[in-house]
């Protein structure tokens, strides 16, 4: 059975008080609409139609992709009118309708809903709520069959007492959708074309309305203001934390941990408080991450340790390597097994060989550093001449003295040593000692300057 998906994303979101279209507001580092599209793709539809209106150009620019068909709704005349804009493009047997501001919907929930659809049956996702204020109410007959959905503003007192609410998410036979949207009327309190009226039409046409419910009501929670957006964020993070813990991760405090992307984890991983994982992060077995760390698009091999207040972006830490506290590993950085990066060390596009060490107050950029090499405190690679970047190469078992400036391009061969305080501008051969500093001069009888008296 073929499937197409329609995502409604045309709303203005005035209560957000923002120039940004509502569906582009972020949850866990991705726009709300981005989350919905991600879930939709996992259902393997033949096409995804995104109905856009307010901020249409911004939405299209942010999320444009080959599998998305953006459909413009010039005037926002209701959900039924929005779906009708996509109908001319639909050819599939089944159409699933989703909402661009409902980012937490689970794929498993949608899969259950889709199983309810057939030529003579549609699937409707409903939710039981203690307080259904704002939701359309699911009206059932004496046999428990769904007969209609009544919107809050059109409901009488008895209907408002119903606690089963409409989520708006439904799956319908594709061949019938055009007929139903064509018959919609705006004769209601809002003066809009309600998609919910399709339910009564389906019942009138003799179709069965089968319902499913999410395991968690937050799956179908939308965000109309910043408070609701924050609630979605926190729920997403707690859910992400539970998933990681189920895979063998210890979180010191799941309430102080954020995932903003994709995380692949091994077992016996320990993550302390206030850690943020962004982009695609791979964490192998026995990794330890200290508090207040930000890790983006990085890979941490087995047994790697990141100490407090460190920042990784586009880095790879080898097996048993460690970094921090207060280390910064920028894009292109690779630490081989057992390499050590200490406090206040910054690396960019740098490769540290096995067992290499940079313990303190160091900048290494565009550098290749051999195994077991030791970088003294206060060392920097001078890799930029104002126009081009140049490479510093150090062989194995090199000893770099403290407070060195290594002016690239420069090659320090295996076994070489540089003296403390040196500025190294020339290549150093194997086993050589390089001294690149002024000779010390001691002056006898030196008299310190006296303080000038002010008038």
UniProtKB/Swiss-Prot annotation:
<dbReference type="GO" id="GO:0005737">
    <property type="term" value="C:cytoplasm"/>
</dbReference>
<keyword id="KW-0573">Peptidoglycan synthesis</keyword>
<feature type="binding site">
    <location>
        <begin position="78"/>
        <end position="79"/>
    </location>
    <ligand>
        <name>UDP-N-acetyl-alpha-D-glucosamine</name>
    </ligand>
</feature>
<feature type="binding site">
    <location>
        <position position="420"/>
    </location>
    <ligand>
        <name>acetyl-CoA</name>
    </ligand>
</feature>
<dbReference type="GO" id="GO:0009252">
    <property type="term" value="P:peptidoglycan biosynthetic process"/>
</dbReference>
<comment type="similarity">
    <text>In the C-terminal section; belongs to the transferase hexapeptide repeat family.</text>
</comment>
<feature type="binding site">
    <location>
        <position position="73"/>
    </location>
    <ligand>
        <name>UDP-N-acetyl-alpha-D-glucosamine</name>
    </ligand>
</feature>
<feature type="binding site">
    <location>
        <position position="151"/>
    </location>
    <ligand>
        <name>UDP-N-acetyl-alpha-D-glucosamine</name>
    </ligand>
</feature>
<keyword id="KW-0677">Repeat</keyword>
<feature type="binding site">
    <location>
        <position position="363"/>
    </location>
    <ligand>
        <name>UDP-N-acetyl-alpha-D-glucosamine</name>
    </ligand>
</feature>
<dbReference type="Pfam" id="PF12804">
    <property type="entry name" value="NTP_transf_3"/>
</dbReference>
<keyword id="KW-0133">Cell shape</keyword>
<dbReference type="Pfam" id="PF00132">
    <property type="entry name" value="Hexapep"/>
</dbReference>
<feature type="binding site">
    <location>
        <position position="348"/>
    </location>
    <ligand>
        <name>UDP-N-acetyl-alpha-D-glucosamine</name>
    </ligand>
</feature>
<comment type="pathway">
    <text>Nucleotide-sugar biosynthesis; UDP-N-acetyl-alpha-D-glucosamine biosynthesis; N-acetyl-alpha-D-glucosamine 1-phosphate from alpha-D-glucosamine 6-phosphate (route II): step 2/2.</text>
</comment>
<keyword id="KW-0963">Cytoplasm</keyword>
<comment type="pathway">
    <text>Nucleotide-sugar biosynthesis; UDP-N-acetyl-alpha-D-glucosamine biosynthesis; UDP-N-acetyl-alpha-D-glucosamine from N-acetyl-alpha-D-glucosamine 1-phosphate: step 1/1.</text>
</comment>
<comment type="subunit">
    <text>Homotrimer.</text>
</comment>
<feature type="binding site">
    <location>
        <position position="136"/>
    </location>
    <ligand>
        <name>UDP-N-acetyl-alpha-D-glucosamine</name>
    </ligand>
</feature>
<feature type="binding site">
    <location>
        <position position="402"/>
    </location>
    <ligand>
        <name>acetyl-CoA</name>
    </ligand>
</feature>
<dbReference type="InterPro" id="IPR038009">
    <property type="entry name" value="GlmU_C_LbH"/>
</dbReference>
<dbReference type="GO" id="GO:0000287">
    <property type="term" value="F:magnesium ion binding"/>
</dbReference>
<dbReference type="InterPro" id="IPR011004">
    <property type="entry name" value="Trimer_LpxA-like_sf"/>
</dbReference>
<feature type="binding site">
    <location>
        <position position="377"/>
    </location>
    <ligand>
        <name>acetyl-CoA</name>
    </ligand>
</feature>
<comment type="function">
    <text>Catalyzes the last two sequential reactions in the de novo biosynthetic pathway for UDP-N-acetylglucosamine (UDP-GlcNAc). The C-terminal domain catalyzes the transfer of acetyl group from acetyl coenzyme A to glucosamine-1-phosphate (GlcN-1-P) to produce N-acetylglucosamine-1-phosphate (GlcNAc-1-P), which is converted into UDP-GlcNAc by the transfer of uridine 5-monophosphate (from uridine 5-triphosphate), a reaction catalyzed by the N-terminal domain.</text>
</comment>
<keyword id="KW-0961">Cell wall biogenesis/degradation</keyword>
<dbReference type="GO" id="GO:0016020">
    <property type="term" value="C:membrane"/>
</dbReference>
<dbReference type="InterPro" id="IPR001451">
    <property type="entry name" value="Hexapep"/>
</dbReference>
<dbReference type="GO" id="GO:0000902">
    <property type="term" value="P:cell morphogenesis"/>
</dbReference>
<keyword id="KW-0548">Nucleotidyltransferase</keyword>
<feature type="binding site">
    <location>
        <position position="224"/>
    </location>
    <ligand>
        <name>UDP-N-acetyl-alpha-D-glucosamine</name>
    </ligand>
</feature>
<protein>
    <recommendedName>
        <fullName>Bifunctional protein GlmU</fullName>
        <ecNumber>2.7.7.23</ecNumber>
        <ecNumber>2.3.1.157</ecNumber>
    </recommendedName>
</protein>
<feature type="region of interest" description="Linker">
    <location>
        <begin position="227"/>
        <end position="247"/>
    </location>
</feature>
<dbReference type="Pfam" id="PF14602">
    <property type="entry name" value="Hexapep_2"/>
</dbReference>
<dbReference type="InterPro" id="IPR029044">
    <property type="entry name" value="Nucleotide-diphossugar_trans"/>
</dbReference>
<keyword id="KW-0012">Acyltransferase</keyword>
<feature type="binding site">
    <location>
        <position position="101"/>
    </location>
    <ligand>
        <name>Mg(2+)</name>
    </ligand>
</feature>
<feature type="binding site">
    <location>
        <begin position="99"/>
        <end position="101"/>
    </location>
    <ligand>
        <name>UDP-N-acetyl-alpha-D-glucosamine</name>
    </ligand>
</feature>
<dbReference type="GO" id="GO:0071555">
    <property type="term" value="P:cell wall organization"/>
</dbReference>
<feature type="binding site">
    <location>
        <position position="22"/>
    </location>
    <ligand>
        <name>UDP-N-acetyl-alpha-D-glucosamine</name>
    </ligand>
</feature>
<keyword id="KW-0808">Transferase</keyword>
<feature type="active site" description="Proton acceptor">
    <location>
        <position position="360"/>
    </location>
</feature>
């Amino acid at each position: 059975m073929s499937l197409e998906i329609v995502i409604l994303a045309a709303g203005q979101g005035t209560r957000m008080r923002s120039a940004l279209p509502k569906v582009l507001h972020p949850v866990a580092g991705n726009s709300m609409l981005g989350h919905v599209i991600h879930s939709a793709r996992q259902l393997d539809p033949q096409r995804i139609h995104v109905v856009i209106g307010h901020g249409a150009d911004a939405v299209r620019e942010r999320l444009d992709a080959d599998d998305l068909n953006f459909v413009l709704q010039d005037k926002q005349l209701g959900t039924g009118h929005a779906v009708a804009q996509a109908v001319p493009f639909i050819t599939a047997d089944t159409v699933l309708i989703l909402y661009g501001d409902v980012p937490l919907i689970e794929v498993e929930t949608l899969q259950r809903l889709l199983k309810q659809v057939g030529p003579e049956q549609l699937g409707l996702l409903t939710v039981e709520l203690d307080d259904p204020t704002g939701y359309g109410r699911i009206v059932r007959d004496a046999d428990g069959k769904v007969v209609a959905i009544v919107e809050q503003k059109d409901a009488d007192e008895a209907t408002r007492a119903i606690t089963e609410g409409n989520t708006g998410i439904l799956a319908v036979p594709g061949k019938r959708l055009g007929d139903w949207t064509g018959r919609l009327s705006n004769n209601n309190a809002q003066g809009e074309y309600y998609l919910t009226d399709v339910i009564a039409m389906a019942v009138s046409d003799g179709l069965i309305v089968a319902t499913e419910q999410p395991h968690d009501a937050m799956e179908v929670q939308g965000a109309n203001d910043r408070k609701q957006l924050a609630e979605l964020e926190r729920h997403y993070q707690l859910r992400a934390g539970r998933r990681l813990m189920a895979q063998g991760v210890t979180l010191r405090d799941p309430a102080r941990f954020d995932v903003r992307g994709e995380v692949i984890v091994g077992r016996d991983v320990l993550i302390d408080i206030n850690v943020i994982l962004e982009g695609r992060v791979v964490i192998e077995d026995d990794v330890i991450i200290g508090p207040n760390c930000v890790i983006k698009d990085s890979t941490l091999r087995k047994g790697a340790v990141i100490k407090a207040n460190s920042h990784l972006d586009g880095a790879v830490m080898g097996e048993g390597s460690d970094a921090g506290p207060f280390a910064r590993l920028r894009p292109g950085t690779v630490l081989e097994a057992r390499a050590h990066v200490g406090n206040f060390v910054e690396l960019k596009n740098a490769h540290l060989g096995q067992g290499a060490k940079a313990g303190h107050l160091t900048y290494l950029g565009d550098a290749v550093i051999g195994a077991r090499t030791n970088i003294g405190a206060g060392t920097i690679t001078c890799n930029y001449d104002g126009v081009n970047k140049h490479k510093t190469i150090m062989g194995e078992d090199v000893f770099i003295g403290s407070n060195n400036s290594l002016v690239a391009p420069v090659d320090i061969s295996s076994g070489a040593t540089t003296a403390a305080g040196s500025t190294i501008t020339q290549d150093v051969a194997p086993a050589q000692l390089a001294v690149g500093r002024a000779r010390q001069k001691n002056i006898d009888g030196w008299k310190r300057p006296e303080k000038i008296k002010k008038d």
